[in-house]
Regions:
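Glycine-rich, positively charged N-terminal anion/phosphate-binding segment
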Residues: 2-4, 9, 18-93
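Charged active-site motifs of nucleotide-sugar-dependent glycosyltransferases
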Residues: 12
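An anion-binding catalytic pocket shared by soluble metabolic enzymes
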Residues: 15
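Short connector loops/turns at beta-strand edges and beta->alpha or beta->beta junctions
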Residues: 100-104
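Conserved small/polar residues in nucleotide/adenosyl-binding loops
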Residues: 107-109
């Protein structure tokens, strides 16, 4: 399986982005035990452009984790574009865009 220029083998094992789970220590452990590619925790595009420190910390990656992906999520196109520019500075191998997060309002409560 290939994603862009990254060859992950025939049956790759991918670590999904999980809030408060896929921190650097967990990602390195997963790589040690055979993950072909890992994700950081998913990151809110709104939090990134507002420079929320917890969001920025999620962009920290090391060479030992590669290939590594960062997923940003949001609903506003302009915000996602600005967040993607911020993520580019972290130099992930893959930038995963998630526009699928629904907005829950009072009608759904």
């Amino acid at each position: 399986m290939k994603i862009a220029h990254i060859d992950l083998g025939k049956y790759p094992i991918l670590l999904a982005p999980m809030e408060d789970v896929t921190d650097p220590a967990f990602r390195l452990m997963c790589k040690k035990f055979g993950a072909d590619m890992v994700y950081t925790e998913f990151v809110s595009s709104d939090a990134l452009i507002r420079a929320v420190s917890k969001a920025a910390q999620k962009l920290s990656i090391s060479d030992e984790e590669r290939p590594v992906a960062i997923q940003i999520y949001g609903k506003d196109t302009e915000t996602m574009v600005e967040a993607a520019k911020i993520v580019e500075e972290a130099q992930p191998d893959i930038l995963d865009i998630n526009f699928g997060c629904p907005e829950i309002g009072r009608a759904h409560v």
